[in-house]
Design a protein with these regions (language model features):
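Terminal export signals
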Residues: 8-11, 29, 38-40
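Chymotrypsin/trypsin-fold serine protease catalytic domain
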Residues: 1-10, 51
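Domain-level detector for secreted/extracellular nuclease and nuclease-toxin modules, and
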Residues: 79-379
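Catalytic nucleophile loop of clan PA
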Residues: 2, 14-35
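Eukaryotic short linear interaction motifs
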Residues: 18-20, 33, 42-44, 166, ...
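Structural detector of coil-to-beta-strand junctions
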Residues: 8, 23, 34, 45-47
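C-terminal cap/linker of serine protease catalytic domains
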Residues: 37-86
Length: 379
C-alpha cells in the first residue's frame, strides 16, 4: 500500500486486464484491505478500501441506502461504555503535591533530556498557581503536560518509561485537573459516540504505569486526565503508531530499558472547527533513549495524520485493521520543531535524520512506515 485516500487506496503489484474486483490482501495477516478496480502501467494500482465496501454492503442489506442520499457518518470509538465516562468526583489541587512529573535526568546524569520548550506560541502557554508559585507544567506520575490556553488541549506531553518495572493496572474514568480552570479543559464538547471523537491519549495509558504497585497504579490513572488527550478518530490509532514506544524499548540499553517520549498535536490554521473545537489534523512524537549498540543518546521523530478520516459533512469511514494502512512517517526532529514551534534542545542533533534538509520541509512525498524495521535509529 503506497497511498491512502478517502475512498480508495493505491497499491504496488502486477495486475492484468480482468483483475478488477479482485481482493487485495495484506500478506502479514491475511486480511482483505480492498477490491482492485484499475491501474496505470508502471505507475500504480487502485483499490476501493475494504471499509468502504463493507459499509455499502451493510447499508444495502439493512435498506439504509434508500434513505441516505447524502453523506453518511460511520466510525468506531476508541473506547466505549464505561471507559468514556467522566468521573464527577471533585478532587483538590493538593492531591497532586506528590507528583514529580517528567524527569530530565531519567536516562542518566550524562544524558539530560529537558522537557521541550514551547517557543513560537510561548504567550499561549497556560500558567496556573500551585504550591505558592506560578507554573506552566502539570506534573503527574512519571509524566508532565504543557497546556495551550487558546486550544484548551496540550501542546505536549512528556513521559519517562521504564520497561523493566512496567505493571498493568485497571482503567478508570476520565477526569479533569483541579489545578487549572474547568474552562481551560475540554470535557465533553467534541467527545462521545460517533460521529464525535475519541479521547486520544498523548502519553499512553500504559507508559507511566511502572514502579511499585501503588506508583504504577497512580501513573496509569493519571493518564486519564482530559489534559492528556486530544480529539482523534479511531482509525488514527494505526498499529505502527501505537507500537513506536515498544519498538524503541527493544533497542534501548538492555540493562536499563528506559526511554523518554514526547507527544503532541500540531496546531495550524487549517484545523477544522467541529463541535466548537478546533481539531488537530496531524500529531507528532519524539522518542529519546540510550542505544544498546552505541551507548549514545539517540532520538527519533515521527508524524501521523488523521486528515484522511475527516471528510466533508463528517463522512468518516470505519477503522482499518491492517498494519499496512498506517500513515505514520519518520521525520527529522528539526522538521517537527519548525512546524510545531516547540524546541527539543539537544535531541535534534542526535537524530539519525539530522542533516536531511529535504526532510525538514513538506516538499515531496514521504515514505510511510509499513514496518517497524524501516525506522532508522543510527546514522
Amino acid at each position: 500500500v503506497t497511498q491512502i485516500e478517502s475512498t480508495r487506496l493505491c497499491h504496488n503489484c502486477t495486475t492484468l486486464g480482468g483483475n478488477s474486483g479482485s481482493v487485495v490482501f495484506d500478506l502479514t495477516n491475511g486480511q482483505a484491505v480492498g477490491l482492485h478496480f484499475s491501474g496505470s502501467f508502471l505507475a500504480t494500482n487502485y483499490a476501493v478500501r475494504a471499509d468502504v465496501v463493507k459499509k455499502l454492503l451493510d447499508d444495502i442489506h439493512s435498506g439504509r441506502w434508500r434513505r441516505q442520499p447524502g453523506g453518511v457518518s460511520l466510525t468506531f470509538p476508541a473506547d466505549g461504555g464505561e471507559t468514556d465516562l467522566i468521573d464527577e468526583t471533585e478532587s483538590v489541587a493538593s492531591d497532586y503535591s506528590d507528583r514529580g512529573g517528567y524527569d530530565p535526568e531519567f536516562l542518566g546524569s550524562r544524558f539530560v533530556v529537558d522537557l521541550p520548550t514551547v517557543t513560537r506560541h510561548a504567550d499561549d502557554v497556560l500558567d496556573f498557581e500551585f504550591d505558592g508559585e506560578t507554573q506552566t507544567e502539570l506534573r503527574y506520575e512519571h509524566f508532565s503536560v504543557v497546556m495551550s490556553r487558546s486550544r484548551r488541549m496540550c501542546f505536549l506531553s512528556g513521559c519517562n518509561i521504564d520497561g523493566n518495572l512496567s505493571k498493568k493496572s485497571a482503567r478508570v474514568r476520565w477526569k479533569g485537573d483541579p489545578r487549572i480552570p474547568k474552562s481551560q479543559q475540554i470535557m465533553k464538547e467534541c467527545y462521545g459516540a460517533p460521529p464525535k471523537f475519541s479521547r486520544g491519549h498523548m502519553t499512553r495509558r500504559e507508559d507511566p504505569g511502572w514502579g511499585t504497585r501503588a506508583v504504577a497504579k497512580r501513573g496509569n490513572e493519571d493518564t486519564m486526565h482530559v489534559t492528556n488527550v486530544a480529539p482523534q478518530m479511531q482509525a488514527f490509532n494505526a498499529p505502527i503508531w501505537l507500537a513506536l514506544e515498544d519498538y524503541a524499548l527493544q533497542h534501548a540499553r538492555e540493562d536499563e530499558m528506559k526511554i523518554s517520549v514526547f507527544t503532541g498535536p500540531y496546531f495550524t490554521d487549517r484545523d477544522p472547527d467541529m463541535y466548537g473545537v478546533l481539531i488537530p489534523l496531524t500529531y507528532w512524537k519524539v522518542i529519546a533513549f540510550i542505544h544498546d549498540d552505541t551507548g549514545k543518546l539517540c532520538a527519533t521523530g515521527y508524524e501521523m495524520s488523521q486528515e484522511q478520516s475527516l471528510q466533508p459533512e463528517e463522512f468518516v469511514f470505519g477503522v482499518f485493521t491492517s498494519p499496512q494502512l498506517g500513515t505514520a512517517t519518520q521525520v527529522p526532529i528539526r522538521s517537527i520543531e519548525a512546524k510545531s514551534g516547540i524546541h527539543f534542545g539537544k535531541l535534534a542533533s542526535v537524530d539519525p535524520l539530522a542533516g536531511d534538509e529535504e526532510g525538514v520541509s513538506d516538499a515531496g512525498p514521504r515514505t510511510p512506515l509499513l514496518a517497524l524495521e524501516q525506522i532508522r535509529f543510527v546514522r
